[in-house]
Amino acid sequence: MLYKLSKRTYLFLLLALLSTNTIAARVVNEEIALIISEHSGSVTNKHALQLTIKQLQALPQLEIKTQTRWTQGEKRFKGPLLRDVLALSAKKARYITAVAINGYRVDIPSQDYLNIDVILALTQADKPLTLRTKGPIWIIYPWSARPELEQGAYYSRAVWQLSTLEIYE
């Protein structure tokens, strides 16, 4: 059955929807978005560092224009360098393990983020990444600028919906 909505009801519903999105965006900015845990031998400090999107946005941002296997055409991604985020931890990493919300895990050698401008993308085309668009955090390599990176090993490290970085000494 189709209901006719009055103009007033329609405006109320529209305002409610818009305010919900604003509230959701505010919550995402203030909730813990990334956990950096430190591992040394058999000792784990699971919650060494907890960062919000707002804190990640406060770091210097780098824009990368690149094509990916998961998007069409060249896209603009922006976020802090992975090495800058890891520098917030006191530990020097031999490698890290990136963990996605769904449990996907992949090791990333320190040579990657020390020698390549790998970012933790927070936006695509100036729009915040969402769960639907592989966010709120997506590891992005500069594939278009560095064709030698266009291989399976590097693509497998492009973790989307990143939730945790585990640092191993």
What are these regions (language model features)?
Residues 2-11:
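Bacterial N-terminal signal peptides that target proteins for export
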Residues 19-22:
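N-terminal signal peptide c-region/cleavage motif recognized by signal peptidases
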Residues 25-80, 84-169:
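N-terminal intrinsically disordered, low-complexity segments enriched in P/E/S/T
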